[in-house]
C-alpha cells in the first residue's frame, strides 16, 4: 500500500463555509497579536519543543517569530485581516537572536527557513514598506552575502541549503529587478547541476544530502529532490534555454524513476534506497506525494501531468494527517497539493477537495489549542500556516509561503 492508514484520520464532514473560514483567520490574527510580548515573542509550542530548542522562543521563519509576522503581513496584504501591529523593531532584533540560537547546531546560519535569509527578506520588505530605504539597502546587501555564502551548502535541501536561498534570490529579483539576484540564482543552479549526478540506486540523477550526520539521497520537498527542483522551476526564465531544457528532462526523469505506482495513485519513499524495511510510506509536504505536487506543479511539461494527478489522488485518498494541521507535515501542507493541482489543471474538483482539507485543518488547530491550552504560533508547523492555506482556499491562490512569488 502506498500510504499508512494509521498516520491519517477520516476527513470531517463539515461543509465548506467561507464566512466561517474568514472568521477563523481573523480570530487567529487577533489572538496572535494579543498573546505577543516583546521579550518572549510567542511561546514555543510543546509539539515544536525539542532537544535543540527546548521551550526557547524561536526567531526564524520555519517555527519562529519571523514566520508568524510574515503570515500576518501576508494576510493583511491580501486584505484577509486588518493591518497588524508594527513589529518592525522586533524584526530588527531577530537575526542576532537566530544566530545565537542556531549557530551551535552546525548547519550554518544563512538558510531561508531555519537561518537568517528568511529573516532578512522579512526585514527588507518591512523596511521598504516603512520607507526606511537605507536600512533596506543594508539588509539587501547582507542577504546577498548570505545567499552567496550558502552556495555549496552540503545539506542540498530547503531548510538550510542553497536551494532555499535560491528562492530568496528569486524573491528579491522579483521585487527589485536587480541583476545581482539573477546572477546569484544562476551560480547556485550551476553548483546544483554539478551535484545532481547519476545514482547507483535508481535510473536517474539524485542529490546526496549531508545532514544530521548522515548522507542520504532524499526525494521529498523538505529535504530532497522535489524541493530543489522547485527553485529551478520557479527561476527557469533566468536560465539559458538549453540549460533549462537539460534541467527539465532530468527533473521529469527523476520524478518518474523514483515514483511508486499503484493503479491511479503515486507516492515516493523518503529516500533512495529506503532506510526502513518495510519503507515508511509518508504522505506529507516534507516527504511524499504532496510535496512532489507542490514542487513540480509549476513545471510546464505535459510529461508530468498524469504523475502529478496520481500523486494528488493519493494525497486525497490518504486523507488528513493525524500529526496535525500544519504545512510541513500536516493537513494544510497536503491540502496545498490539491490547490496546486487546481491551479495547474483548472479542474474545480481539486478546489473543492482543498477546501474540505481546510475545514478539517481549522478543526485540528482548535482541538490542539484546547488540548495544550495555547495556539501553535509557527508558520510551517502550526496555525499561521493554516491561516495562509485557508485564505488560499478562499481566494483560489495556491502560492506556498516563502517558496512562491510574493507581493
Model-derived features: where do they sit?
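Solvent-exposed loop and edge beta-strand segments that line ligand/cofactor-binding
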Residues: 43-65, 98-116, 148-162, 210-226, ...
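Extended ligand-binding clefts on enzyme/binding-domain cores
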Residues: 180-305
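Well-ordered alpha-helical scaffold segments within catalytic/enzyme domains
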Residues: 1-17, 66-81, 118-130, 166-178, ...
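Low-complexity, Ser/Thr/Pro/Gly-enriched N-terminal "stalk/linker" regions
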Residues: 1-65, 70-74, 78-92, 183-202
Amino acid at each position: 500500500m502506498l500510504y499508512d492508514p494509521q498516520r491519517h484520520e477520516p476527513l470531517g464532514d463539515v461543509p465548506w463555509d467561507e464566512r466561517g473560514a474568514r472568521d477563523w483567520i481573523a480570530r487567529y490574527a487577533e489572538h496572535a497579536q494579543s498573546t505577543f510580548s516583546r521579550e518572549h515573542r510567542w511561546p514555543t509550542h510543546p509539539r515544536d519543543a525539542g532537544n535543540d530548542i527546548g521551550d526557547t522562543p524561536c526567531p526564524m521563519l520555519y517555527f519562529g517569530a519571523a514566520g508568524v509576522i510574515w503570515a500576518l503581513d501576508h494576510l493583511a496584504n491580501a486584505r484577509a485581516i486588518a493591518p497588524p501591529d508594527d513589529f518592525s523593531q522586533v524584526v530588527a532584533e531577530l537575526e542576532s537572536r537566530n544566530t545565537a540560537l542556531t549557530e551551535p547546531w552546525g548547519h550554518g546560519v544563512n538558510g531561508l527557513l531555519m537561518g537568517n535569509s528568511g529573516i532578512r527578506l522579512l526585514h527588507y520588505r518591512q523596511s521598504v514598506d516603512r520607507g526606511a530605504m537605507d536600512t533596506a539597502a543594508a539588509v539587501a546587501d547582507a542577504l546577498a552575502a548570505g545567499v552567496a555564502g550558502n552556495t555549496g551548502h552540503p545539506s542540498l535541501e530547503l531548510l538550510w541549503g542553497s536551494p532555499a536561498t535560491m528562492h530568496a534570490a528569486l524573491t528579491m529579483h522579483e521585487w527589485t529587478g536587480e541583476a545581482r539576484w539573477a546572477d546569484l540564482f544562476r551560480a547556485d543552479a550551476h553548483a546544483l547541476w554539478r551535484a545532481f549526478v547519476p545514482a547507483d540506486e535508481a535510473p536517474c540523477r539524485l542529490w546526496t544530502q549531508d545532514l544530521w550526520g548522515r548522507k542520504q539521497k532524499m526525494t521529498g520537498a523538505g529535504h530532497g529532490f522535489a524541493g530543489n527542483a522547485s527553485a529551478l522551476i520557479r527561476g527557469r526564465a533566468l536560465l539559458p534555454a538549453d540549460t533549462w531544457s537539460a534541467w527539465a528532462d532530468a527533473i521529469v526523469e527523476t520524478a518518474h524513476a523514483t515514483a511508486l505506482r499503484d493503479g491511479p495513485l503515486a507516492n515516493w519513499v523518503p529516500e533512495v534506497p529506503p532506510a526502513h524495511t518495510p519503507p515508511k510510506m509518508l504522505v506529507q509536504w516534507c516527504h511524499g506525494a504532496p510535496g512532489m505536487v507542490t514542487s513540480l506543479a509549476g513545471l510546464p511539461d505535459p510529461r508530468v501531468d498524469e504523475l502529478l494527478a496520481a500523486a494528488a489522488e493519493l494525497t486525497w485518498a490518504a486523507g488528513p494527517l493525524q500529526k496535525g494541521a500544519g504545512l510541513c507535515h500536516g493537513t494544510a501542507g497536503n491540502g496545498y497539493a490539491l490547490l496546486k493541482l487546481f491551479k495547474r489543471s483548472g479542474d474545480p474538483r481539486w478546489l473543492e477537495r482543498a477546501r474540505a482539507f481546510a475545514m478539517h485543518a481549522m478543526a485540528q488547530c482548535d482541538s490542539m489549542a484546547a488540548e495544550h491550552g495555547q495556539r501553535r504560533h509557527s508558520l510551517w508547523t502550526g496555525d499561521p500556516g493554516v491561516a495562509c492555506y485557508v485564505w488560499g482556499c478562499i481566494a483560489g491562490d495556491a502560492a506556498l509561503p516563502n517558496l512562491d512569488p510574493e507581493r
